[in-house]
Amino acid sequence: GIIGTIMGILSGYFGGWIDSVVMRITDAFYSIPLTLFAMVILTIMDPGVLTLVFVIGVTNWPFYARMVRSEVLGLKNKEYIKAARTIGTSGKMIMLRHILPNILPTFIVVSTLSVASSILIEASLSFLGLGIQPPAVSWGVMLSDGRNYLATNWWMATFPGIAISLTVLGIMLLGNWLRDVLDPKNQGLR
């Protein structure tokens, strides 16, 4: 998320050829199906925790770049940004002191949703045998092992599935709550 955030801030603030290059790179990443990309990388590299973290990070940064870019495009023409430019504040300081703090609430909410998505990606890749490998523990591995015993030991697959569902639901609810708490429109209502 950090790489995507930096790329999005630079792209949105400076515009021009930087924006074009960053957005074409994100378009290229979006054109590749996430699961297919992850499967290719995980079959080329040694499947394990570090490889899985790398794959999830590489597949998530374009989303952050687009989200942050759209926020920056909305902020860069605000009066306080224009005033900062007028008094000679450098672009770096404007990005760090004015833009970054104002996109932080959106970034936090999107990060919680990204965590939920990452859990689902990890579980699905581990279920397919491309993620975390036994004897390491993963809900996806537990689901994969339990599917062979559904008729006799149904709980082996049911409880990991419920755990995944409840965890993702809890994280999504946390993201919605954070959105409501951090939304500037709701500040006067509390």
Regions found by a protein language model. Name each.
Residues 1-190:
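Alpha-helical transmembrane segments of integral membrane proteins
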